[in-house]
Amino acid sequence: MSSYLFTSESVSEGHPDKIADQISDAVLDAILAQDKRARVACETMVKTGVAIVAGEVTTSAWIDLEALTRKVILDIGYNSSDVGFDGETCGVLNLIGKQSPDINQGVDRKNPEQQGAGDQGLMFGYATNETDSYMPAAIHLSHRLVEQQAKIRKKKNSALSWLRPDAKSQVTLRYEDGVATAIDAVVLSTHHDPGVKQKDLIEAVREEILKPVLPAKWLHKGTKFHINPTGKFVIGGPVGDCGLTGRKIIVDTYGGWARHGGGAFSGKDPSKVDRSAAYAARYVAKNVVAAGLADRCEVQVSYAIGVAEPTSISVTTFGTGKIADELIEKLIRKHFDLRPFGIIQMLDLIHPMYQQTASYGHFGRKPKDFTYTDGTGAQHSATSFSWEKTDRAEALRAAAKLK
């Protein structure tokens, strides 16, 4: 019997890097709501008293970037100098310019289906049947812990009103013969008001954050809990650390369980395959697993800038495939259009739905229908997290001729 430990971590919406991600995606959403043909590459940096928003944008839309940035910061919970960062009074510096026409000529085409990739690169998608979300269990639980911290913090008349926005989680699982069997260790560090006793904080976090999230069947006498292990976390957020867009790419994806091509997601419109192709690869892998073709599946795609067709598609099922990996690859090529325009159409990506992806993971979330108003006042309907649908699983299973 093989036995090993595996660890993943997550961070809350109030973590400095996640503040930056959310601002970048809020800018993207505001532009896409007005201009579906926009090209956006938005980067943000936050530090004590200032948010710097930079990047390259080509659009006919106009947005109030300063007001938008302040709203994101305030909605997260940074609304007072006592907390260390205040969306009302912080400086907002706009350094956004235009996208290079050299990139535009490689991406835009008279025939939309021949739209080229916005850059070269390689992207991975992954899925596993060890959780209902088809995500590795360690990252799934890590996300839910910091999500619960935010939920309790924002709850009206919360008994834990002393919680502040910044938080981190980490979960270590024990695996026996490739199956998760127990939680070996949990780390939860949460930003808090001064004067909170460590004993009271530990008890409250156990009852209100850990207990509702962690599966009782995986907890045992030997499970180690590290709650604010330094004993104090009063200085947090952008005062404690500088935050940058795109610096939590493992948190955003599979917690280290699957490989990563290196490209970040937030602030990038769907013409950037760093984002759209990673979403498509997840969609493909999840449908392969949901179809029962494998227990685990990792899909890699790669692109050349200005070229529509992927330069490669490869599949590995880690020995769990019910048919050969080569046959799964052929099915993928037949059932999924992985050209940039094909991905955008397949997943219906040109909608303002990205800010909600910028915290608690881009994957393993439930698709959600929503409506929004564009720049002309017209109403539109869309589905966020469309890459989490398993609507092609049945066709894949039938094509594979599995009983």
UniProtKB/Swiss-Prot annotation:
Reaction it catalyzes: L-methionine + ATP + H2O = S-adenosyl-L-methionine + phosphate + diphosphate
Biological pathway: Amino-acid biosynthesis; S-adenosyl-L-methionine biosynthesis; S-adenosyl-L-methionine from L-methionine: step 1/1
Compartments in which it is found: Cytoplasm
Pfam hit, one: S-AdoMet_synt_N
Binding site for L-methionine: 56, 99, 241, 272
Amino-acid positions noted as binding Mg(2+) in the UniProt annotation, renumbered to this chain: 17
InterPro entries in the cross-refs: ADOMET_SYNTHASE_CS, S-AdoMet_synt_C, S-AdoMet_synt_central, S-AdoMet_synt_N, S-AdoMet_synthetase, S-AdoMet_synthetase_sfam
SUPFAM superfamilies in UniProt: S-adenosylmethionine synthetase
Binding locations of ATP: 15, 166-168, 232-233, 241, 247-248, 264, 268
Gene Ontology annotations for the cellular component aspect, listed alphabetically: cytosol
Enzyme class, first EC level, given as a word: transferase
Keywords linked to the UniProt accession: ATP-binding, Cytoplasm, Magnesium, Metal-binding, Nucleotide-binding, One-carbon metabolism, Potassium, Transferase
Alphabetical list of Gene3D superfamilies matching this protein: 3.30.300.10
Stretch list, region Flexible loop: 99-109
Cofactor note: Binds 2 divalent ions per subunit. Binds 1 potassium ion per subunit.
Biological processes, Gene Ontology terms: one-carbon metabolic process; S-adenosylmethionine biosynthetic process
A molecular-function term among this protein's GO annotations: magnesium ion binding
Oligomeric and partner information: Homotetramer; dimer of dimers.
NCBIfam families cross-referenced by the UniProt entry: metK
Protein name, entry field: S-adenosylmethionine synthase
Gene name, Swiss-Prot/TrEMBL: metK
